[in-house]
Amino acid sequence: MQITILGSGVIGVTTAYYLAKLGHEVTVIDREEGPAPETSFANAGQVSPGYASPWAAPSIPLKAAKWLFQKHAPLILRLTTDPVQYRWLLQMLANCTDSRYKINKTRMVRVAEYSRDCLIELRKDTGIEYDQRSQGTLQLFREQYQLDGIGKDIEVLRQDGVPFEVLDRDGCVNVEPALAHAKDKFVGGLRLPNDETGDCFKFTNALAKIAEGLGVKFRFGVNIKSLLMSGGKISGVETSEGIVTAERYVVALGSYTPALIKALGLNAPIYPVKGYSITAPIVDESRAPVSTVLDESYKIAITRLGDRIRVGGMAEVSGFTDDLPAARRATLDLSVTDLFPGGDLKAATFWSGLRPMTPDSTPIIGGTRYDNLFINAGHGTLGWTMACGSGRLLADLISGNKADIRADDLGIARYN
């Protein structure tokens, strides 16, 4: 089939790759001049299925109220005049129950674990390189109450068969030796040995080249204006370079997905939640991480990417903003300096990206009420973690193949 994919981030490119492998004729359209220049450009770098947890958790309402008054809060709420923001926040609050948390986390871990397996298989098949490491991730707890409160997450990990280790201070230092100098800064950790790390931008660009070798065509610098309808189905995409037609269409536009499909009467409650990162060259190996360490207090991930340290995190609900506040940079600097002062922060680059978040933190993967329109968006903070699995899953659904994992609860129908 002829298939047009809108969006060339990591989700769009992985979808294109898997569709091409199944023999489809694929075209990818994006307004940017190359793959992954926005949200996929400088994310935290970890592929962490076991840490796939909803932001909408039972404890979040109370924590959010406290964070409003903290200088280095992991969640920042900047209210706008946009009613969409308020509706999204209310929907998120509705998911902050024990029952919804378990349902959402189970769905997220299902997609994320499958995606990690798909990534490993893709790497074996292609030999793709992207500063990859397979040395697990460590969630670091600075306070005892944080360590004491991981029971619900461990329950889900056991239920899903995800290996884990609860570590004391010495155990944390054993897997991340550079933490030896900071043993007084934490009480313990939760380690997931099967998690990985890697540069999402490098991966996406390398995979785009591999996809081109499979026949995928990329049309960059093309603005997407609207989806056209005829006879109850999508008949084309109106772009700055004319109308593009295909047999099937995939919307993989991250936070911009709702605006495109709204005219079709489709509701995708995806809202941009801004994240920040810095990337610094390593100048002291003995004080740099081996893999990824998640600083639970600040919700920040510190990741080793080759000869660089990537420090990323926080969640700012402020709409489509691209500013780089000094206060956010200060929080990133504080966390990494405290734990892994092996990078040259003076030479670091500062970045922000808009994570496409759904109220339940679960991505939208699947078809719509229009037979030839599909969506792959809303992965939030886990686009890199879920990319390969999401792309392969949707490719199977479009092709009429039996999916490897359950997909009926991932579609847009849960909102419409």
Swiss-Prot record:
Its cofactor is FAD. Its EC number is 1.4.99.-. It catalyses: a D-alpha-amino acid + A + H2O = a 2-oxocarboxylate + AH2 + NH4(+). Pfam families: DAO. It is an enzyme of class 1 (oxidoreductase). Pathway: Amino-acid degradation; D-alanine degradation; NH(3) and pyruvate from D-alanine: step 1/1. Transmembrane segments: none annotated. One of its GO terms (biological process) is D-alanine catabolic process. Keywords: FAD, Flavoprotein, Oxidoreductase. Oxidative deamination of D-amino acids. This is D-amino acid dehydrogenase. The gene is dadA.
